A protein has these predicted regions:
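A structural boundary/capping signal
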Residues: 1-185
């Protein structure tokens, strides 16, 4: 027998068991991360870069500091900030909110990641909407906005936020047919 001492033998079994359990945990965690961050939509893959880090929290709070908890003001202030960032096609995967701000450009997925990250840290229910060759954000606002159209999902009112149109306002008109919506994430 390789190990004569019973105590050492049991300790080695325990260490082996803990190691194997840890490896299995890492593998399962990795699958979960990939499943939630890389989403296949037809023949393309969307990379979720939504972040709720300190940078995004400070940015969202700074942009909404003059809104006195007015939800429409908060959403529009964040949307205004994002739409002022120049649109430029990014051939690589979607970038984080901080990267978009620091590099001062982004395409639809970059700018939508920035916008939805800020909305999430401020507590808004918001989702990505994927349509052919484009992505935009929808946000739930309890307040009904007069003379503006909303999308209703599970009886909740959502307004379209278009991050790539300079000066875009809440409730941007839907430029796609409903059957062109590939996913709401």
């Amino acid at each position: 027998m390789l190990i004569e001492n019973r105590f050492l033998k049991y300790i080695s079994f325990l260490i082996s068991f803990i190691f194997i359990t840890y490896v299995i945990y890492i593998i399962i965690s990795s699958f979960s991360i990939v499943k939630n961050q890389f989403i296949d939509i037809g023949d393309t893959t969307y990379v979720n870069q939504v972040r709720t880090d300190d940078y995004t929290i400070k940015l969202a709070n700074h942009l909404t500091k003059d809104c006195a908890s007015n939800k429409v003001c908060e959403v529009q202030a964040m949307l205004d900030f994002v739409t002022k960032i120049p649109y430029k096609i990014n051939e690589s995967i979607a970038r984080s909110a901080k990267q978009v701000v620091e590099q001062n450009f982004g395409d639809c997925d970059d700018k939508s990641n920035l916008l939805i990250s800020m909305l999430k840290v401020k507590g808004y229910e918001a989702y990505f909407v994927l349509v052919p060759k484009h992505i935009f954000v929808i946000v739930n606002l309890e307040q009904k906005l007069q003379n503006l159209k909303a999308l209703y999902i599970n009886e909740k009112r959502f307004y379209i936020l278009e991050s790539t149109a300079i000066g875009s306002k809440i409730a941007f008109p839907l430029k796609y047919n409903f059957n062109e919506i590939e996913a709401i994430l």
